[in-house]
């Protein structure tokens, strides 16, 4: 990099933008009937001059898709003539108008918006292979969304001492789509009010899934609901607190009931195995004589257990971890920890139940992307309901990413796109420099850059172009 004689000049007037992939995303939404679904269900505006409800919703979703960090970033797009021409828009709502739109929502209208998005989602699922969602995994968890605001309505102080909200997130693990988002005060526990939303998620995927499994941590082991879900044919794998009764039952098992738990490697080595690097942290901990807990071994067993509010017993899979407590080079004691998983699955062995339960941890990655990828949990507006609406509209950007991957003709590349972080998706698919040319009735995006996903981008665009509108 030796360039030093650098000058800047104004170019001749031309229309270009650095996120040409937005045209393909917009075309996908049109073919799926997303805007029509929103406008047909959501009635918040008395007069649709100059905007419809879908214009406001897509404006916030596209702001996230164009790497917008704040509501104020919408102003950049309002003044971008190439962006407006690329979407065939005369104008888009400004940040203040977008914030005002979120304050029009009540709980029913937020639900209506989510159902409009889910109706569009069903059209994506209809175009998938026959074995798609043969076994659907619905994951659920709560998280904290802090805010520095002093006047945010509905916020509360969480158990961590953070002011803000405590959203409930229900996702489909197979595609990493967000099915439902529920905003709650910051002092809400993870499972608070979750049952109706779990039931809605079940009804959403039931027409497509031959089998449904619910997964959650110990907070979601709702013993009053397990029998009902079991009678409906719904499977579940939930963590369970290691309270004294189940610990005593685990300790009373004969040693022959336990067998070593072998963890499968996370990936296969394609070339030759390499030497593992030295663990610098552990070396420092030993040298300094700090307290160090090291896993020595794991074993697994199972027994039947009937929770207090259940009318029948279920499998309780228990993992016993042998932890060596060390200080420097000296072993202080051997500590035994128990982890429990309750399930009504009968066709999986104990090791497979543990593996499936641990796979739910991938939902933490989805939550991270919602927080810092699409920035859906910044809570920038007035109160609990308006921030809930903002959260749903911004999270639509994450679902648009998933739908684009599901509609990609190259199935392998599409599944790879589902696993991508949001920022990588933006750089590979959305942030394609393009010149905007209006020719007759056509809007032409002339791509001016290249990456190794461009072949798949054009194949997907051709597929979307030929797709019959909903």
Residue ranges and their predicted role:
Residues 15-16, 46-55, 331, 381-390, ...:
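Structural motif
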Residues 59-60, 74, 92-94, 98, ...:
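Short, conserved catalytic/metal-binding motifs centered on acidic residues
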Residues 70-73, 147-149, 178-180, 224, ...:
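Short helix/loop capping segments that flank catalytic or ligand/cofactor-binding pockets
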Residues 74, 350-384, 388-389, 393, ...:
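Short amphipathic alpha-helical "interface-anchor" segments enriched in bulky aromatics
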Residues 399-446:
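C-terminal structured "cap/appendage" subdomains that terminate the fold
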């Amino acid at each position: 990099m030796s360039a030093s004689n650098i000058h800047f000049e104004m170019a001749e007037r031309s229309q270009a933008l650095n996120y040409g992939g937005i045209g393909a995303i917009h075309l996908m939404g049109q073919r799926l009937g997303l805007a029509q679904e929103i406008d047909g269900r959501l009635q918040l505006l008395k007069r649709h001059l100059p905007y419809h409800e879908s214009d406001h919703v897509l404006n916030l979703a596209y702001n996230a898709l164009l790497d917008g960090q704040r509501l104020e970033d919408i102003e950049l797009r309002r003044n971008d003539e190439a962006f407006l021409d690329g979407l065939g828009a005369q104008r888009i709502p400004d940040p203040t108008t977008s914030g005002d739109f979120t304050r029009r929502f009540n709980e029913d209208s937020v639900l209506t918006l989510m159902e409009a998005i889910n109706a569009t989602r069903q059209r994506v699922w209809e175009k998938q292979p026959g074995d798609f969602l043969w076994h659907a995994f619905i994951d659920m968890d709560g998280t904290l969304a802090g805010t520095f605001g002093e006047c945010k309505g509905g916020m509360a102080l969480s158990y961590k001492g953070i002011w803000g909200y405590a959203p409930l997130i229900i996702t489909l693990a197979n595609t990493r789509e967000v099915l439902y988002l529920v905003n709650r005060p910051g002092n809400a526990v993870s499972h608070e009010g979750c049952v109706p939303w779990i039931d809605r998620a079940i009804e959403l995927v039931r027409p497509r899934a031959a089998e449904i499994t619910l997964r959650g941590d110990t907070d979601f082991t709702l013993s009053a609901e397990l029998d009902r879900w079991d009678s409906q044919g719904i499977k579940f794998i939930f963590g369970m607190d290691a309270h004294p009764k189940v610990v005593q039952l685990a300790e009373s098992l004969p040693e022959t009931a336990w067998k070593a738990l072998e963890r499968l490697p996370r990936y296969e080595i394609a070339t030759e195995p390499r030497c593992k690097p030295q663990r610098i942290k552990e070396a420092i901990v030993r040298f300094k004589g700090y307290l160090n807990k090291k896993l020595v071994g794991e074993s697994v067993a199972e027994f039947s257990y009937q929770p207090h509010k259940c009318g029948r017993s279920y499998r309780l899979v228990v993992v016993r971890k042998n932890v060596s407590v060390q200080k420097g080079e000296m072993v202080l004691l051997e500590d035994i920890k128990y982890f429990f998983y309750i399930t009504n699955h009968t066709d999986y062995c104990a090791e497979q139940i543990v593996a499936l339960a641990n796979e739910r941890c991938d939902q933490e990655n989805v939550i991270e992307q919602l927080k810092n990828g699409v920035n859906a949990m910044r809570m920038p507006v007035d109160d609990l309901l308006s921030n809930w609406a903002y959260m749903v509209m911004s999270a639509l950007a994450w679902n648009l990413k998933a739908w684009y991957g599901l509609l990609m003709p190259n199935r392998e590349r599409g599944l790879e796109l589902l696993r991508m972080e949001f920022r990588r998706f933006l750089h590979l698919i959305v942030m394609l420099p393009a010149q905007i040319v209006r020719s007759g009735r056509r809007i032409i995006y002339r791509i001016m850059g290249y990456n190794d996903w461009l072949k798949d981008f054009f194949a997907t665009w051709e597929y979307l172009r030929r797709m019959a509108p909903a």
